[in-house]
């Protein structure tokens, strides 16, 4: 189990803590260790070595991958999951782009494969994100509302009222 690592990148510390707790509970019976790595939670080299899944914020993972002293650790990473990848178009997008570009460059120079997976519940431009991740067509999966266990009904209502109070009453 210590031959490779999985990194799960979540956009907020609260989400990192939640995912760490959920995965720890589900995977502990399999002997898989899950740890949080954020600006508030630091891991020693030995803790990192004995951890199989690291849940991190984009900013912390960006810092780790920039350090040349962490190269051996980074080379053990075989899977990077980026949750909420639609944030590429957000103010934090450049950090995610940097992580993706650095990972792709590392794969090209070391010839050690690392899989990049992007997750989002709201991603209308999934083909563009697939291009950023350099995903082949057969490796790009998009699940529309037809895959939902409970059908999703959408309704659009137009409000033409211009006056604030009346407009709010109509919207509510």
Model-assigned labels for residue ranges:
Residues 13-14, 71, 86-93, 117, ...:
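Flexible beta-alpha connector loops of hexameric P-loop NTPases
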Residues 54, 58-62, 68-111:
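SF2 helicase catalytic motif II
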Residues 13-16, 41-43, 59-62, 86-88, ...:
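Conserved nucleotide-binding/hydrolysis micro-motifs of P-loop NTPases
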Residues 18-26, 60, 76, 95-103, ...:
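Alpha-helical scaffold elements adjacent to nucleotide-binding pockets in ATP/GTP-utilizing enzyme cores
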Residues 4-63, 131:
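Conserved nucleic-acid-binding Ia/Ib motif block in the N-terminal RecA-like helicase ATPase lobe
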Residues 101, 114-172:
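Conserved interdomain linker/interface between the two RecA-like ATPase lobes of SF2 helicase motors
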Residues 1-2, 26-30, 45-49, 70-75, ...:
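Conserved catalytic network of the ASCE P-loop NTPase/AAA+ motor domain
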